[in-house]
């Protein structure tokens, strides 16, 4: 090869670019919930798919998984697991059948045996075509919401856990009524106290919680 055709290629620059692209994809498109609506992409796509076919009746979870696969490119198992976890929190999804129990660790029945529909709360607070920004789905056949216009701090109600690339999130769940009271206090510009709470009950020591700021500690059992 002549000297004129030789070219220096800096591999470290390429790896840095590839890593940043991969990290951004995993964190934004899979692992970490968005602070605005409190949802990971798979959760958002599940709720959107349920809204598209909602007629007020229960639908088999196996059917809902299939509907969501039109928007989510990562397979039925991840969709089914995410749907069950949303349903077990008894806020956004109205369930029917054996959905397992987070207190005992019992798993849900197979998707063909359990049913679900959006809860009245979800229908009232989470959807508005006029205030929703849309994007095309991964295959360009459907449109899906970039974010859901949820009128409630769902991220705090559900809590969140996700491990991305160089980034991790762990947010404890909070009490529904206390979140409503805190939201009203914010609107009225009043002070309030808000601490984590759990559907399973228990005891919590918030002496060093520091309002949830970095460095704060909380003990639960």
Specify the residue positions occupied by each region the protein language model found.
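Short, intrinsically disordered, charge-balanced linker/junction segments flanking boundaries
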Residues: 215-221
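Catalytic phosphate-handling regions of large nucleic-acid enzymes and associated NTPases
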Residues: 1-215
């Amino acid at each position: 090869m002549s000297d004129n055709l030789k070219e220096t290629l800096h591999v470290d620059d390429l790896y840095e670019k590839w890593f940043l692209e991969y990290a951004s994809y995993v964190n934004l498109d899979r692992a970490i919930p968005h602070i605005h609506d409190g949802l990971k992409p798979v959760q958002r796509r599940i709720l959107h798919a349920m809204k598209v076919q909602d007629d007020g009746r229960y639908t088999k979870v196996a059917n809902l998984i299939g509907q969501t696969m039109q928007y989510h490119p990562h397979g039925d198992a991840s969709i089914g697991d995410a749907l069950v976890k949303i349903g077990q929190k008894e806020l956004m999804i109205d369930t029917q059948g054996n959905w397992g129990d987070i207190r005992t660790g019992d798993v849900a029945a197979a998707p063909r045996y359990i049913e679900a529909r959006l809860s009245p709360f979800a229908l009232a607070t989470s959807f508005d075509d006029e205030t929703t920004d849309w994007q095309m789905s991964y295959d360009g056949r459907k449109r899906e919401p970039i974010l859901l216009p949820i009128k409630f701090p769902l991220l705090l109600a559900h809590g969140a856990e996700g491990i991305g690339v160089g980034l991790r999130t762990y947010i404890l769940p909070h009490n529904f009524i206390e979140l409503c009271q805190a939201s009203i206090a914010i609107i009225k510009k009043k002070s309030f106290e808000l601490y984590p709470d759990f559907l399973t009950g228990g005891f919590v020591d918030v002496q060093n919680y520091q309002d949830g700021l970095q460095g704060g500690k909380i003990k639960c059992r």
